[in-house]
């Protein structure tokens, strides 16, 4: 608040200190500074109070105020002290800035000319200079700022690793078991006991808590992962059981050949197999055998066991298992022979006195003539099949 003092002139007559009248009295004013009657020729008036000319002074510098003063509350100040105390303050030195002084501004901060300088090199910044304004209103020139950033990056990259001894580690673990998140005074006590820095102690507790949390999470993940694996295995086991049952049904169904034509139907239309009137057992697969039993191009493949076709044959073998009773469909009229050497083909023998037998080619091997007049069996065949393949039609029975 700006107040201007006025000089009041006492116009009372000389020698008359007070004039008493019937209607009232006129008193001599008292000084607000010294609390005495003002008998001077001139009286100063400020803040609606009267002052001696020597009593009206600045509250800070005690300079007598004769023409103009500034007040705040019950105190009176000169112009300089008033702006120093209540005016705009410099962001660097925190002192008031008079309104007549030249200043510099950086965003919302105001500086004295001599305070507008770099805090590192103390160089006063001029108009056009590049600088960085810190959060605490300090100024740093561009060169010093970039140098400080480079040093900080190098120090961060070359930061030495802290080594904790076994005794220090035992002390920290004991404190962690007591409280995983200790208070500040506990960390200070641990720092003094172990000789480690406060920051090191704080980081150790943070890392320890993070490790415990990670271990708990991993344990839960393993537990749930094992549970889901067991569930998947159980579901896979039940599915495999169903598949095995289905495969068993398919395997049983593959034994019968309801859609396969008989050899009589497959043979030539000359009535060669028409004299075979007695049906034989159907082709069957031994229990537990793997793979499918197929009949292709009139040939019988696979190392299976069948009945002997004629008495006195040197190739007699035990009878094959009976075919399933529940399988429908026509049964083939011809059985086959099996030999230790699976590479040999199969040739059925005809009835005595009948036409010469036809050659039946196996699905996966060469043809062979099994109806020879030899009584010794396999040693009578030549070493090479090519030498006897063409002699099958001229074999003697």
Swiss-Prot record:
Ranges of Pro residues compositional bias?
316-331
Q: One Pfam annotation, family name?
A: Homeodomain
Its function?
Transcription factor. Recognizes and binds to the consensus sequence motif 5'-AATTAATTA-3' in the regulatory elements of target genes, such as glycoprotein hormones alpha chain CGA and visual system homeobox CHX10, positively modulating transcription; transcription can be co-activated by LDB2. Synergistically enhances transcription from the prolactin promoter in cooperation with POU1F1/Pit-1. Required for the establishment of the specialized cells of the pituitary gland and the nervous system. Involved in the development of interneurons and motor neurons in cooperation with LDB1 and ISL1.
What is its quaternary makeup? Interacts with POU1F1. At neuronal promoters, interacts with LDB1, in motor neurons LDB1 is displaced by ISL1 and a ternary complex is formed in which ISL1 contacts both LHX3 and LDB1; allosteric structural changes in the DNA binding domain of LHX3, induced by the ISL1-LHX3 interaction, may explain differences in sequence specificity of the different complexes. Interacts with LDB2. May interact with CITED2/MRG1.
What Gene3D superfamilies has UniProt attached to this entry? Cysteine Rich Protein (2.10.110.10), Homeodomain-like (1.10.10.60)
About its domains, the entry says: The LIM domain specifically interacts with the Pit-1 POU domain and is required for synergistic interactions with Pit-1, but not for basal transcriptional activation events.
LIM zinc-binding domain residues are 31-81, 90-144
Q: Which gene encodes it?
A: LHX3
List every position bearing Phosphothreonine. Answer: 63
Q: Which UniProt keywords apply?
A: Activator, Disease variant, DNA-binding, Dwarfism, Homeobox, LIM domain, Metal-binding, Nucleus, Phosphoprotein, Repeat, Transcription, Transcription regulation, Zinc
Q: Which residues carry this modification: Phosphotyrosine?
A: 227
What CDD domains does the record tag this protein with? homeodomain, LIM1_Lhx3b, LIM2_Lhx3_Lhx4
GO CC entries = chromatin; nucleus; transcription regulator complex
Record-annotated DNA-binding residue ranges: 157-216
Q: GO biological process annotations for this chain's record? A: animal organ morphogenesis; apoptotic process; inner ear development; lung development; medial motor column neuron differentiation; motor neuron axon guidance; negative regulation of apoptotic process; neuron differentiation
| Name of protein | LIM/homeobox protein Lhx3
MF terms per GO, please? DNA-binding transcription activator activity, RNA polymerase II-specific; DNA-binding transcription factor activity, RNA polymerase II-specific; RNA polymerase II cis-regulatory region sequence-specific DNA binding; RNA polymerase II transcription regulatory region sequence-specific DNA binding; RNA polymerase II-specific DNA-binding transcription factor binding; sequence-specific DNA binding; transcription coactivator binding; zinc ion binding
């Amino acid at each position: 608040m700006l107040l201007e003092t006025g000089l009041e002139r006492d116009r009372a007559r000389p020698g008359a200190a007070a004039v008493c009248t019937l209607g009232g009295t006129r008193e001599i004013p008292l000084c607000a500074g010294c609390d005495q009657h003002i008998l001077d020729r001139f009286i100063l008036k400020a803040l609606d109070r009267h002052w001696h000319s020597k009593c009206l002074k600045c509250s800070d510098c005690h300079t007598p105020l004769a023409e103009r003063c500034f007040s705040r509350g019950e105190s009176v100040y000169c112009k300089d002290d008033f702006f120093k105390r209540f005016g705009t303050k410099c962001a660097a030195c925190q002192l008031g800035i008079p309104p007549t002084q030249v200043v510099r501004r950086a965003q919302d901060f105001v500086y004295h000319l001599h305070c507008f300088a770099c805090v590192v090199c103390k160089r006063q910044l001029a108009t056009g200079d590049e600088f960085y304004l810190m959060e605490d209103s300090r100024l740093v020139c561009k060169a010093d700022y970039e140098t400080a950033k480079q040093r900080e990056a190098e120090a961060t990259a070359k930061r030495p690793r802290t080594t904790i001894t076994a005794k220090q580690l035992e002390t920290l673990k004991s404190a962690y078991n007591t409280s995983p998140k200790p208070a500040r005074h506990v960390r200070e006590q641990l720092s003094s006991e172990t000789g480690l820095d406060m920051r090191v102690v704080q980081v150790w507790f943070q890392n320890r808590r993070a490790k415990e949390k990670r271990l708990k999470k991993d344990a839960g993940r393993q537990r749930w992962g094992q549970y889901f694996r067991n569930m998947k295995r159980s579901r896979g086991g039940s599915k495999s059981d169903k598949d095995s049952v289905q495969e068993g049904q398919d395997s049983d169904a593959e034994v019968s050949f309801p859609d396969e034509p008989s050899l009589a139907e497959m043979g030539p239309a000359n009535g060669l197999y028409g004299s075979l009137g007695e049906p034989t057992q159907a082709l069957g697969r031994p229990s537990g055998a793997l793979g499918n039993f197929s009949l292709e191009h009139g040939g019988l493949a696979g190392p299976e066991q069948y009945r002997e076709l004629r008495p006195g044959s040197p190739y007699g073998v035990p009878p094959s298992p009976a075919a399933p009773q529940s399988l429908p469909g026509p049964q083939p009229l011809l059985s086959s022979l099996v030999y230790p050497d699976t590479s040999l083909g199969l040739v059925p023998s005809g009835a005595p006195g009948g036409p010469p037998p036809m050659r039946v080619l196996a699905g996966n091997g060469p043809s062979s003539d099994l109806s020879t007049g030899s009584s010794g069996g396999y040693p009578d065949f030549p070493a090479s099949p090519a030498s006897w393949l063409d002699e099958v039609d001229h074999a003697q029975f």
